[in-house]
């Protein structure tokens, strides 16, 4: 690990690490890291890698090789000052856990994850919770066939205006509690292909909307409470 400047560190490693769980967690003095010499080709665990790095503003991870990674849960959780995040070369083909991956990234305005393959992911719980500066999020390409937990997935994404989840397969999802709660500016939500057959807990699936006129079933009556009253939700036929 080499120092460069007051708040910038160049990361280098002569050995091939396999588990870098919490490697940089809770470091409060850095604003950026240089990973151009960091070999991640053998890594399988990146859980909580940057957890609670509350002063980091820029992360360019375009050099990361993630072909073998299975766990990315809490990877950027509570990186509350993070503004620029480059994940353009991430290979997520083997990733199983994305729980709270971006949870608490409240300064992140743009998030490009168009390259993410989520076909093996089983948990997306709180994946984007408290991403309160995000205005747009393109995840239409997400494959969610294996996902069983989506609770709090977009909780308090308070600036997001449009969410197109029309390609989501939710047949195996068991919990959607508070999935859209406190999405205060959400205008359009497309969930036309959502399946609720295995849901154990509907309460507060919330998009901050009273749909009592359209939904009388007491089991899902609180599904969309407390969001933008003008939000248009597209359901299936």
Each model region followed by its residue ranges:
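Negatively charged
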Residues: 1-237
